């Protein structure tokens, strides 16, 4: 009798590294998770230690197999999904980073972005990379490291330094430096990649003065990139055969592989993607055009709206404001009041993402009166997540001409029934919550499994997708529009706050 086989998904996120073991029926067998340090050297700056990312991720891999009580030779393949845009530069010879990882949330490159705008690069970047000029993307982060670490640009030219997003870093470490590779989805988030020619963009490399020698090879999201040895007797070599940035992995895990299907992931930030099939839709409404995974991991395109603060705003209620002890408490307190008593919270702690793209916006609470209590502020913070999602959906529908009939949701905050119901109310559309919540890991597992024949095709996966609960709108259109108008007023007043500082 042959031993039962499994897929392992490594999910390297913004605040933790996770490993998930799945069987052929897409059941989760075991999960391991380790948090790591968030480093804030200056206001608006965010870093991670790349060695800590690697240490936490590699230890979760060992732990998850031990928890599942399976041996490494029962693993058919490993898929990787990761926080996108986060930028690492390391020495080819030693594998040692020359600087901390600069995280996607970090705003330190706002000045470089202003220069790009002044130099008239906006249209070129929009047309060729699908992105807007913002500190969010990797390109300006790589430039910043090369500008600030002495001698690094020359070393990069000589081929001594390598750049990678987190997927590239993990695969480099897992293959002992044999494989320097990324996939199309991660490359499409760097602002250095031409999403039409599917190659690094020479003009962007020239403008940011980034040597091509340091860039990884770009491949499909579902194929064998290399093999890793995860110990065990004789050290079984396991194929690494799936890579996708976290949001594209979630889109694939939700099986949004047809044009017009959309999902929203509620994690640290909020990320909404709509598959636009084989055509790259240029956004006129502040969204990104990005690469997604087609039915067999080939290139599809998607529209994306990124909201910077979702789950992070609930953490703020807990850690900084001390209004709740646990993120799960937010639903309980939000339902202790009938409404927000006119309060709007705009959680623009690190600026605003789509569709506004204002790095100078800052967080604010509007509509405070003497009758407002902590529960109103908690409720308004949760509601802000749903309002920001509507901002993105309005832009998406305008760009694509597609009216969304249902939104598939995933991520930690979808366990919050109050938030999901309010999301449906404020969108005026169905919200579908799947039974398997780990859809990001699921997407990475699907991509890895399809590449090695663990699953034969998408039809086999469709049978495994079960909707656990559907939320339907429960408020009238006039009420919906009235509340949303208040939100738009609040957003307007939070914008450009920092710009006026001398």
From Swiss-Prot:
Reaction catalyzed: glycerol + ATP = sn-glycerol 3-phosphate + ADP + H(+)
Pfam assignment, any one: FGGY_C
PANTHER family, A to Z: GLYCEROL KINASE (PTHR10196:SF69), SUGAR KINASE (PTHR10196)
Protein name: Glycerol kinase
Any one GO CC term of the record: cytosol
Enzyme nomenclature, EC number: 2.7.1.30
Species the sequence originates in: Escherichia coli O81 (strain ED1a)
Binding site for glycerol: 84-85, 136, 246-247
Record carries keyword Transferase: yes
Quaternary structure note: Homotetramer and homodimer (in equilibrium). Heterodimer with EIIA-Glc. Binds 1 zinc ion per glycerol kinase EIIA-Glc dimer. The zinc ion is important for dimerization.
């Amino acid at each position: 009798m042959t031993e039962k086989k499994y897929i392992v998904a490594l999910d390297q996120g913004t605040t933790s590294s996770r490993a998930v073991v799945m069987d052929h029926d897409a059941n989760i067998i075991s999960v391991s998770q380790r948090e790591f340090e968030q480093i804030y050297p200056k206001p608006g700056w965010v870093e991670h230690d790349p060695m800590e990312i690697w240490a936490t991720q590699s230890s979760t891999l060992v732990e998850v197999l031990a928890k599942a009580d399976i041996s490494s030779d029962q693993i058919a393949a490993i898929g990787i999904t990761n926080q996108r845009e986060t930028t690492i530069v390391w020495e080819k010879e030693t594998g040692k980073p020359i600087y901390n990882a600069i995280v996607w949330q970090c705003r330190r490159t706002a000045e470089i972005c202003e220069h790009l705008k002044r130099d008239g690069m906006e249209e070129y970047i929009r047309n060729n990379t699908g992105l807007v000029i913002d500190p969010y993307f990797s390109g300006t982060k790589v430039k910043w490291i090369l500008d600030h670490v002495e001698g690094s640009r020359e070393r990069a030219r000589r081929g001594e330094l390598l750049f990678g997003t987190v997927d590239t870093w993990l695969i480099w470490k897992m293959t002992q430096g044999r494989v320097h590779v990324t996939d199309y989805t991660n490359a499409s988030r760097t602002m250095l990649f031409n999403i039409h020619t599917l190659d690094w963009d020479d003009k962007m490399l020239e403008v940011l003065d980034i040597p091509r020698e340091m860039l990884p090879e770009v491949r499909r999201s579902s194929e064998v990139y290399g093999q890793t040895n995860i110990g065990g007797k004789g050290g079984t070599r396991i194929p690494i055969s799936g890579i996708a940035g976290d949001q594209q992995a979630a889109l694939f895990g939700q099986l949004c592989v047809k044009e017009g299907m959309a999902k929203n992931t509620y994690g640290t930030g909020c990320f909404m993607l709509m598959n636009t099939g084989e055509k790259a839709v240029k956004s006129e409404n502040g969204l990104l055009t990005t690469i997604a995974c087609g039915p067999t991991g080939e290139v599809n395109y998607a529209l994306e709206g990124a909201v910077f603060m979702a789950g992070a705003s609930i953490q703020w209620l807990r850690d900084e404001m001390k209004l709740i002890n646990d993120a799960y408490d937010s639903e309980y307190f939000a339902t202790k009041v009938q409404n927000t008593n006119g309060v709007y919270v705009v959680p623009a702690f690190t600026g605003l993402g789509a569709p506004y793209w204002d790095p100078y916006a800052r967080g604010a609470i509007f509509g405070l009166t003497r009758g407002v209590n902590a529960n109103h502020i908690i409720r308004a913070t949760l509601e802000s997540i749903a309002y920001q999602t509507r901002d993105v959906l309005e832009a998406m529908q305008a760009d694509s001409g597609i009216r969304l009939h249902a939104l598939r949701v995933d991520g930690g905050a979808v366990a919050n029934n109050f938030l999901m119901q309010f999301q449906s109310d404020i969108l005026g559309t169905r919200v579908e919550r799947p039974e398997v919540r780990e859809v990001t890991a699921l997407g990475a597992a699907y991509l890895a499994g399809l590449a090695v024949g663990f699953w034969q095709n998408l039809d086999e996966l469709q049978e495994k997708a079960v909707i656990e609960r559907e939320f339907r709108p429960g408020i009238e259109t006039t009420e919906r529009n009235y509340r949303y108008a208040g939100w738009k007023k609040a957003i307007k007043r939070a914008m450009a706050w920092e710009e006026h500082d001398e």
